[in-house]
C-alpha cells in the first residue's frame, strides 16, 4: 500500500474525514472502476447502479481492509464482484451467466456512439460474447493493463488460470473479428 493509499484509508476510517477521503478515492479511482464495471455489464445505467453498490460496499467494508493488497486492487475486487452479482441477478434461475453474451452483444450495438466505427463495435461485441471468466481476464489485462498478479489478487484466481483465460479470450476475439469482417 502506498503512502497516499494509507492516508486515504486512515481518513476513511475517521468519521469526520470520511466524506472528503471518499471524494478523493473516487477522484483517484472512480473512472477506472466505472469503465471496468461498464465493460462487464455494458449498459451505462447498469454500470451506474453497480458503482453505487460498489461505493456502499467500500464504505461499509473499509474497517475490514487489511492493506494486504493495494487499495485499488481491493476496490477492483469489490467492483468486479458487484458487477458479476449484477449479471447473475439479470439471469433467470435456469440460465447460466455465460448465456448473457448474446444480449450483451446486442446492448453493445445499442450503446455504441454514433461516431463509433464498425471495427470498434465488432470488437466490443466480440468481447461481450466471451464467457464470463475470459471476458473478465481480457478486460483487466487489455483495457485496465493490470498485471496477472494484480488480476489474481482481484479475482482470487491462479495466475496460470488467468493467463489461459486471457489467451483463449484473445483467440476468440480474433476469430469473431475474422468471421464478421466486412
Located regions from the model:
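N-terminal module of bacterial RNA polymerase sigma factors
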Residues: 1-32, 150, 182
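Internal acidic/polar
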Residues: 2-7, 93-116, 120
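Sigma70-family region 2
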Residues: 14, 39-42, 53-70, 89-91
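Amphipathic, Lys/Arg- and hydrophobic-enriched alpha-helical face
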Residues: 26-44, 61, 127, 172, ...
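Structural recognition of an alpha-helix C-terminal capping motif at a helix-to-coil junction
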Residues: 35, 49-56, 69-81
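Arg/Lys-rich amphipathic alpha helix in sigma70-family domain 2
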Residues: 64-66, 77-97, 116, 168
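DNA-recognition helix of helix-turn-helix
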Residues: 84, 126, 134, 149, ...
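A short pre-motif secondary-structure segment
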Residues: 137-141
